[in-house]
């Protein structure tokens, strides 16, 4: 069974699945779209490094093995149709909704849930919505929230070793065959905001037409390789 999304192809084979990263990059609920040769392999390896780091922190992810150049062997999950966002600083849609300055600290990590629905522009929902709509139980939502904060603080610590700031990050979770909440999808410049002394190292370069996003994505991969080898 195969499934193709905007940036990945999923192939389920027996007890495992293969997650193949495409070279596509999108923004604005898919309205902006380009193909950047090499992006898929960069995001796949970045994800593999960061998920391996998380597993060393006793955090469950779907990663089994990185198959160069652009494929991850993963545990199949029954995915929640959600994006779980953790914000450490004000940025993006948070500033548009609530005001404030980009890069302003939040007093505590803020967790937000969004239903994956491009036509409705990924509506933000609360835990009660998730239960009423049959998307997740309150217990599952709390597990996702708890895991998302733990993962974010671990990644914040990882990047701080090189004086990079993690501003916010988006996750997708699913259930394994035993009903455990497990981190799926990817961790890459497609899914987080990463800054260094005001310089942007994430998809905002593409969203805002600030230059070559592939160059920044490569620099993030090199950073992850370097930090991983320390």
UniProtKB/Swiss-Prot annotation:
Highest taxon of the lineage: Bacteria
E.C. code: 6.3.2.6
InterPro entries, alphabetized: SAICAR_synt/ADE2_N, SAICAR_synt_PurC, SAICAR_synthetase, SAICAR_synthetase_CS
Functional pathway: Purine metabolism; IMP biosynthesis via de novo pathway; 5-amino-1-(5-phospho-D-ribosyl)imidazole-4-carboxamide from 5-amino-1-(5-phospho-D-ribosyl)imidazole-4-carboxylate: step 1/2
Reactions performed catalytically: 5-amino-1-(5-phospho-D-ribosyl)imidazole-4-carboxylate + L-aspartate + ATP = (2S)-2-[5-amino-1-(5-phospho-beta-D-ribosyl)imidazole-4-carboxamido]succinate + ADP + phosphate + 2 H(+)
Keywords: ATP-binding, Ligase, Nucleotide-binding, Purine biosynthesis
Cited SUPFAM superfamilies: SAICAR synthase-like
GO biological process, one term: 'de novo' IMP biosynthetic process
Disulfide links within the chain: none
Protein name, entry field: Phosphoribosylaminoimidazole-succinocarboxamide synthase
């Amino acid at each position: 069974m195969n499934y193709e999304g905007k940036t990945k192809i999923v192939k389920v084979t027996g007890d495992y699945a293969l997650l193949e990263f495409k070279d596509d990059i999108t923004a604005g609920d898919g309205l902006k779209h380009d193909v950047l040769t090499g992006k898929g392999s960069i995001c796949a390896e970045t994800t593999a490094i960061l998920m391996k780091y998380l597993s060393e922190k006793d955090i469950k992810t779907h990663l089994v093995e990185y198959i160069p150049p652009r494929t991850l062997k993963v545990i199949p999950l029954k995915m929640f149709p959600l994006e779980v966002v953790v914000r450490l600083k004000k940025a993006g849609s948070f500033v548009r909704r609530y005001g404030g300055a980009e890069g302003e600290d939040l007093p505590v990590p803020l967790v937000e849930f969004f239903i994956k629905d491009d036509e409705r522009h990924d509506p933000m929902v609360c835990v009660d919505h998730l239960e009423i709509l049959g998307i997740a139980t309150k217990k599952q939502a709390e597990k996702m929230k708890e895991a998302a904060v733990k993962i974010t603080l671990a990644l914040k610590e990882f990047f701080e070793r090189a004086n990079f700031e993690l501003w916010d990050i988006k996750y997708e979770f699913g259930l394994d065959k035993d009903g455990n909440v497990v981190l799926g999808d990817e961790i890459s410049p497609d899914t987080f905001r990463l800054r260094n002394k005001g310089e942007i190292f994430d998809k905002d370069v593409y969203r805002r037409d600030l230059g070559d996003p592939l160059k920044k994505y490569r620099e993030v991969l090199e950073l992850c390789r370097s930090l991983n080898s320390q």
